[in-house]
Amino acid sequence: MHSSKRVMTTKTHVEQPESSMRPQLPESIQGSLMDVGMRVRKSISTGYKSKQTTFPAYNPPLYNTVSENIALKNTAFSYEPNGTKRPFEQAIPNYNWANPPQDFEEPEWLKPFDVVMEGTNERL
């Protein structure tokens, strides 16, 4: 909660005649009431609106025509008609360099420990 309060410093109201039905309140109380009223007004979603609009909110449809839907399904990224789903292995072209043959020997320090120990007679 705020510890500072607003205090009206200037008189913006016109002096009312004595025959008014409203009781006279000190300026500090009038300022507090105005402050509370503005807080209530801010907390209501329509608090700052002075009049209602006559037009309701309108959200146009995402796609206007059937031809737009068909055009979006057939994008440049679909390799088969209608974007048929397929496994990853079929989606990648089969090039020779994709899986090169093993033409080198793997260094000892890259092999798993049990494979390294197969060639020795040592026991753990």
UniProtKB/Swiss-Prot annotation:
Residues 1-31 have a biased composition (Polar residues). It comes from the Eukaryota. Regulates the ribonucleotide reductase activity through its mediation of the nuclear localization of suc22, the small subunit of the ribonucleotide reductase. Delays the progression of the G1-S phase transition, thereby ensuring the G1 phase is complete. Interacts with both p34 and the p34-p56 complex, although no direct inhibitory effect on the bound proteins has been demonstrated. The action of p14 may happen coincidentally with the cdc10 function or may happen downstream of this. Belongs to the DIF1/spd1 family. Ubiquitinated by the DCX(DTL) complex, also named CRL4(CDT2) complex, leading to its degradation. Interacts with cdc22. Keywords: Cell cycle, Cell division, Cytoplasm, Mitosis, Nucleus, Ubl conjugation. One of its GO terms (cellular component) is cytoplasm. It is found in: Cytoplasm; Nucleus. Its main location: cytoplasm. One of its GO terms (biological process) is dCDP biosynthetic process. This is S-phase delaying protein 1. Pfam families: RNR_inhib. Residues 1-32 are annotated as: Disordered. GO terms for molecular function: protein-containing complex binding; protein-membrane adaptor activity; ribonucleoside-diphosphate reductase inhibitor activity.
